[in-house]
Design a protein with these regions (language model features):
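N-terminal pre-catalytic "stem/leader" segment of glycosyltransferase-like enzymes
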Residues: 1-47
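Conserved catalytic-core segment of nucleotide-activated headgroup transferases in glycan assembly
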Residues: 122-173
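Donor nucleotide-activated moiety binding/catalytic core segment of transferases
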Residues: 37-40, 156, 160-209, 213-214
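A short helix->loop->beta-strand "cap" motif at the edges of active sites that frequently abuts
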Residues: 67-71, 205-206
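Leloir-type glycosyltransferase catalytic cores
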Residues: 84-127, 217-258
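Short, well-ordered secondary-structure micro-motifs within conserved domains or adaptor modules
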Residues: 38-66, 187-193
């Protein structure tokens, strides 16, 4: 079976994105995918590979390609192991977040176990509530101006007297924001729209509420240790280092062709 993908690679992307994308392109070719590299979307292949969830240009290209009957592989920085050059990159298909395909994702523990993380129980039933703020690009792209204020208003009605902490989204490596682990430790609840904070909460054992994002799959289930672990095992199949790209593409082909 022949696999063809168009990849958008241009000067609008960061140096880090270029390096990671090149590794993903090389991995695609090693996995038997015929890759066409374009500066602008052309619809040259049945599959389209993009970098940057929540950015305007990739979103427009994705919508055009889906409308034409194609499939879209969309990459961004990872969920766990979020670094730069040695980072894991998260992948989703046709959407911003992969939770719709979690039922088809094997809960094999192998990838999760490579992180050496244990589930924690950091929640306190009488603790504070954390509201994870949106970043500027999400506010703009999704039309969510004031989302945090509305969320806090609802929470004050539900939990009179509770301490509510706004956790601003880090906008730059030069801006100091307390580590999310410290912010949610001792919390009773984390509330976000689609933030990775929900994944941190799943690891930490702090209940969370979200409207979208990878953790939405878990949000629809009981917040038990077994379900948390099941979620994290599935999640880790949706993120890869660029040096794992051939394996990533075998997984992507399985999800696209099954």
């Amino acid at each position: 079976m022949r696999f063809d993908a168009e990849v958008i690679l241009n000067a609008e992307q960061s140096k880090t994105a270029h390096l990671l994308l090149q590794g993903l392109i090389d991995g695609a070719r090693l996995a038997g995918v015929r890759v066409t590299v374009s500066e602008r979307y052309s619809g040259a292949a049945p599959w389209l590979m993009l970098w940057g969830v929540g950015r305007e240009a990739p979103l427009i290209a994705r919508e055009q390609h889906l409308a034409a009957g194609g499939r879209v592989i969309h990459w961004d920085m990872g969920y766990i192991g979020r670094g730069k050059i040695d980072a894991h990159c998260r992948v989703c298909i046709d959407h911003d977040h992969p939770w719709r395909l979690f039922e088809r994702t094997r809960p094999d523990p192998a990838r999760w176990e490579t992180f050496g993380l244990d589930l924690r129980e950091d929640a306190s039933p009488d603790g504070h509530i954390v509201v994870a703020c949106l970043g500027r690009k999400s506010v703009k792209m999704l039309g969510l101006e004031g989302w945090e204020d509305r969320a806090i208003k609802r929470l004050r009605q539900r939990f009179p007297g509770a301490d509510i902490v706004r956790r601003e989204k880090p906008t730059s490596r030069h801006v100091s924001v307390p580590p999310i682990e410290d912010v949610i430790r001792g919390a009773r609840l984390v509330v976000c729209r689609h933030s990775n904070c929900a994944i941190d909460a799943a690891i930490a054992g702090v209940p969370f509420e979200c409207e979208d994002g990878a953790a939405y799959w878990l949000a629809q289930r009981d917040f038990t240790p077994d379900n948390r672990l099941d979620f994290l095992r599935r999640l880790c199949w949706w993120q890869w280092r660029h040096d794992e790209a051939p394996l990533a593409w075998e997984f992507i082909k399985e999800m696209l062709c099954d």
